[in-house]
Each structure stands twice: as C-alpha cells, then as structure tokens.
Amino acid sequence: MSLMKSVVLIFASLAVNIAYSAETNPSIQNYWSIAEQKKLDQDITWQRLMYANKNQKSEVTYAGYFLSENGKNNLKEELKADISALFIPTQDNQSIRCKFPARSQWLIQQLGIQENELPQVKCSEFENWIGQIKPYKATLIYATDFMGNPSSMFGHTLLRLDPKDQQQLNLVSYAVNYAATVAGNDNWSYAWKGLTGQYPGEYSLMPYYRKVKEYGDFESRDLWEYELNLSPEETRFLVSHIWEMQHVSFPYYFVSDNCAYRLLGLVDLVKPESHLQEKFNYASIPMETIKAMQQQGLTKAPVYRPALETQLLAQAHQHGASLAKVAHQLAMKPIKDSSETLKSFSPSDQAKILEMAYDDLYLQFIGRKVEESFAQPQLRQLLALRSQIDLDKQRQEPKRPSTEPTQGHNARNVSLKLGEVQGDKFIEIGHRQAYHDLIDPQGGYRAGTQLL
C-alpha cells in the first residue's frame, strides 16, 4: 500500500458554527476585512488552490475539500470559512491547518496572522507523512512513449521529490504520480473510456524505484529527469498541497486532462507568474509541456536513465554480435553446459558474456517469456559464475542520445503537400496533434515510432 493511501483522514465537520465564531471573535471579522481589501478571493494562488474554472466555480467535486456548505460554487464564502476555521480549537489532526496545510499557510502569510493569535494544533499525521518524504527539491520525470498502452502512447510525466543532499540515493526518494484509476478488466473499452474522461484521475505516492522498475524494466522505456528550478519552500508548499488532494479526483482524459496537464497545475501553483496550464486547453502532450517549462526557465539540464533493454542493446553493440549471440544462448543453457562453453573465451569475454546473459534472461523473465521456476535459479547461478571472475563490471553506460526529447520537432503539425501520382496531380492538407511520421526528423524520438 502506498504511503499516501495508508494515511487515514477523518473529514468530519468542524464541531462549531463558523458564523457564530466570527461574531464572538473580533479577530476573525478583522481578517475578513483585510481579505476583502486585498481581494484575496481573486488572487491567482487562491484560485489555483480552489481549482477555479472560468465561471469562478471549483472543479473539485469532493465535498470534504470545502469548509463552506456552498464553497464549491462561491469561492469567496469558502475563503471566509477557511479564515474562521483557523481560529477554532479542534482535536488533534482535525484543524484546517492539519487537513489543508498549504491553504492555511497561504492565508496566514497573506493576512499577516501571528502564531500567538491562533489556537495550538497537533498535526502528527501530516507531520509524519511529510517527514518521511523530506521534500527539498522536485524533479520532473519523463518516461518515453509506450505503444502497449493507449494512455502512454505520448509518453508520461511524474514528479520525484528529493530530500536535501540525496543525489546518489534518489531511487529511494518518493514520486508523485497522477494517473487514471482503472477498476476491473476494461480491455475492450479502455481506450474509449480514457478518451472520453470516464476514469477518475488521482494522485498517488510511491518510492521512485518502483516507477523505474515499471517503466525502465517492464516496459523498456528510457527516463529523462529534469530537475525543476523550485526553492525548498516552494517544493514543500507543493507537497503540502498534494496532501490536501488525496481524496480528490478529476475526470482523466488521455489526450487533454492527463498526467502532464495536472503536473503543470502543481507548478503553476507555486509559480504564480507562470500560466502553463492555459497553454494546453486541448491537448497536453507530455514532452510539449516540458518544452513549455523549459522556455520559462523552470528546468535544469536533464539526467538520462536508460531502460534495461537499452542497456542490453548497448552492451551487444559494444561487445560485438558474436559475444551477444553466445550470451543469448547461454541464458537458456544448463549451467554445467555454460561452464564448458565459457572455457574457450578469455576472462574478460567471459565476464561480458555472463553479464549480457543475466540481463537477457531477466528481460525474458519480466516479459513472461520464461517460467519463474527456471529463471530464478538460473539467474542466481549466472551471478555465481560471474562472481568467480575477478574483474570489474564490463558494462558500459549506453551512449546518451545526441538529441534530447525536448530538442525534437513539435508534436503538432499542419502540412500542405503537392504532388503527382500516376499522372494525377493532388493537393493534400493535413493536421496532426501529436507524434511524427516518416518525413519528420527522427531526433528526440525513439526509432520505429513513426506513424504510417
């Protein structure tokens, strides 16, 4: 069970009447007046915290997200209710400051409320949760396209949250993923439901290594990691807001309101001057959203994390086709036969063969091409043979692609073609929202993904 899912919040209504509290507490009325003067209900950050649409109503349908009975439809009423709630004593973990820490922090800062004016609160559930994450910086992860899933045909983005000084251990950092929640077996209608918003999109939190294994091992997708130019304070505020969203879902659309679109909203929240989501009202292609962030100086140079299959292919290229062929055969041979085969090779070549054989068999195993009863003991025995060779690993890191994904051509395309076929002249006007075809430059895209 994920860390986020293991947290249980009781969204009970506050055991007081907010209107009555405002009448008996002059501070509340004073801060209402300040909020009115500053027009906080129109502030871009409040609008984004409330997921306000063009009609000034919230997109959120979960009633527990609002303290005012009419908060969804009247964001000004919700603002007043939230200000009042700050001054109401509650049981542990029930304060607005525990349930909505980002919202509360913003209100306290905007109104200049002093800590000694507020009742003491204990938010052990939230503090334990964020204490495990220790957010200090955020990195946007781009997983290249995966043709085996309609929701991932254009790639996928998620967010990794790194503690301070954990550059070498970021696999154990937590990752925030926004994805469609699919219940049951919907194979026949999956694409249609995803295109028409019939699945709920929800945030989830899990260790980053799980996503690396899923994308890099199981689905053979290279990862590109773009650290965001966010301060530690902005990163913590973003994560505090994710806590607020754990019971909230939105209709998930594969092409428009998808993973990339919602992650843009998180960046917009902590960067009020950015208006990233507004640029993607119709189609949110993950790589195009990263380009938009890059244009605003929000990303740093990416780190390339090749998939396991990419690594194996690179080894085969580096070590030569003949050794790669032996490794492929060795992966499926009984170990006693393997020992005889290896004798005709130098220790260096033996190490290369065994390393490739291990990776080859592991890829077949996770791809369900071989049975576990064979694969597990065979993998252990291949490792044992390799450990007997006193040489450092022979694997070399795959060569980084010369063109990064953000340097590839834009996804959207309008074309005008003139030509002649068997004496018949033609004019063709075309429009494409995403992907590329055979006449587009290959740089930044995986080989073999052209539309025909």
Where does each model-flagged region fall?
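Gly/Pro-rich turn-and-neighbor structural signature
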Residues: R97, A102-G148, M153-R160, K271
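Residues on the lipid-exposed face of transmembrane beta-strands in outer-membrane beta-barrel proteins
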Residues: L416, I429-Y435
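Glycine-rich catalytic cores of cysteine/serine-nucleophile enzymes that process amide/ester linkages
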Residues: K134-F218, H431
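N-terminal accessory/precursor segments of enzymes
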Residues: W188-A260, V270
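Activation targets extended, charge/polar-rich intrinsically disordered C-terminal tails
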Residues: A22-L118, Y226, H241-G423
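Bacterial N-terminal signal peptides
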Residues: S6-N17
